[in-house]
């Protein structure tokens, strides 16, 4: 039977994680909220190691819980109404944020059959801009053109796909843990729809990333090698925030002698990468080759034009300042590999010396890597910080059902 106390502590930490990324910025201040955000992520990761082992099959549904269907439908309708108001009030313009307009052009080129031209310069945006987004980031948005709808509905759909796992994990709200997760979901929905500065629905593409990383949490919990490979590929080829965790994951799987998992994941990831290069051309690799240098230059520009992104956000950039961007970038790059490696090294050492097996190491590893990476970004936009929150809430909610081996 799952450890009820650990499950409660996980849920409480998940609620605090959510609060720090939303209301905590206002009431605790950006500095305290940012430090607390990092600390709570570490606490969740450690609790996951000590908590019930997450095991599940793919029996998703709403069996025996008609209230789920009713409340889900009601919530989505209300959410749709609020999102529609946001989109009507703020037409999409590249002058406000160019991410989605760029992806719309990339998607239109793809739909029209100009696959090799997807990464050509876009002359109608900023008098010529080079698109650099990875395939799994922009491909979902290509559905907007044939569907003739606002591209931001893809972001909206991604948000709900990311929230569906923690929501379906709730049953009768008979425990404080379930109420804490439900409260976290409500806080996030309120924040995304009604708080004016996060811009998740109004301007960003981040909903698809939220969905990918929640899919990764489910895949890791399932232990299915093919699903893990697909999920890792989707995350790596959208926002590569957890790329530094891959060598550490490989080391842990080697320690556990999971040869089939290693070979399957490597095969799927390599297939997607090679396939992307063959279909879209070598420029698809620009985010890994050319973007890092431009990223530091962009950070210096943002410090001059919009310092509030750093000072009022959760990231650590406020402590480095504009004069130490290169130093912070070093912490970002090297730390993104070192932190997960040390985490895995500590886990393996514990297992070896104690003879006991830790639970959920892969999920805990991804969470701490994601949180560290986003906190150390030299340009730390607020909407990026909800990926670890949604990943963490999904992992925590899955512990509710570790005994039953399914979600009902």
Q: Across the structure, where does each feature detected by a protein language model lie?
A:
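Start-transfer (signal-anchor) and selected internal transmembrane alpha helices
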Residues: 1-83, 355-368, 397-408
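Membrane-lumen/periplasm interface segments of specific transmembrane helices
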Residues: 19-23, 261-351, 357-372
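Intramembrane catalytic core of multi-pass membrane enzymes that act on lipidic substrates
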Residues: 70-155
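Aromatic- and kink-enriched transmembrane "portal" helix at the membrane-lumen/periplasm boundary
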Residues: 138, 162, 166, 182-209, ...
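Transmembrane-helix motifs of polytopic, lipid-linked glycan transferases
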Residues: 151-176, 346-347
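Specific aromatic-rich, kink-prone transmembrane helix
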Residues: 207-225
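Membrane-interface alpha helices of multi-pass inner-membrane proteins
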Residues: 217, 226-251, 370-371
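Perimembrane helix-loop-helix junctions
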Residues: 245-270
């Amino acid at each position: 039977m799952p450890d009820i106390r650990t499950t409660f502590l996980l849920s409480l930490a998940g609620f605090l994680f959510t609060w720090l990324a939303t209301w905590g910025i206002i009431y605790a201040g950006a500095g305290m909220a940012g430090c607390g955000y990092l600390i709570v992520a570490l606490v969740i990761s450690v609790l996951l190691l000590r908590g019930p082992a997450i095991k599940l099959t793919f029996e998703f549904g709403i069996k025996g819980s008609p209230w789920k269907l009713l409340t889900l439908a009601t919530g989505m309708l209300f959410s749709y109404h609020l999102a529609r108001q946001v989109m009507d009030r703020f037409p999409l313009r590249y002058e406000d944020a160019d991410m989605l307009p760029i992806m719309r052009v990339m998607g239109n080129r793809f739909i029209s059959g100009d696959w090799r031209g997807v990464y050509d310069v876009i002359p109608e945006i900023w008098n010529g801009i080079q698109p650099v987004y990875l395939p799994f980031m922009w491909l979902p948005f290509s559905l907007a053109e044939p569907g003739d709808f606002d591209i931001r509905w893809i972001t909206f759909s991604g948000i709900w796909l990311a929230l569906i796992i923690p929501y379906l994990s709730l049953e009768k709200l008979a425990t404080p843990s379930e109420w804490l997760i439900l409260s976290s979901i409500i806080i996030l929905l309120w924040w995304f729809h009604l708080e004016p500065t996060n811009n998740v629905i109004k301007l960003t593409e981040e909903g698809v990333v939220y969905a990918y990383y929640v899919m990764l949490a489910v895949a890791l919990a399932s232990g299915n090698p093919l699903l893990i490979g697909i999920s890792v590929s989707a995350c790596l080829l959208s926002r590569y925030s957890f790329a530094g965790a891959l060598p550490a994951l490989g080391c842990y799987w080697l320690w556990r002698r999971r040869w089939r998992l290693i070979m399957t994941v490597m095969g799927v990831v390599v297939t997607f990468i090679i396939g992307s290069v063959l279909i879209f051309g070598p420029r698809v690799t620009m985010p890994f080759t050319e973007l890092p240098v431009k990223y530091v230059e962009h950070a210096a520009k943002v410090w001059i034009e919009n310092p509030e992104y750093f000072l009022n956000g959760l990231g650590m950039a406020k402590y480095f300042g504009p004069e130490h961007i290169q130093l912070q970038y070093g912490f970002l790059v090297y730390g993104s590999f070192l932190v997960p490696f040390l985490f895995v090294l500590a886990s393996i050492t514990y297992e070896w010396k104690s003879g006991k097996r830790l639970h959920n190491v892969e999920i805990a590893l991804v969470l701490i890597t994601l949180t560290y990476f986003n906190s150390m970004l030299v340009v730390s936009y607020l909407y990026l910080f909800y990926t670890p929150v949604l990943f963490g809430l999904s992992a925590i909610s899955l512990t509710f059902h570790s005994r039953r081996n399914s979600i009902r």
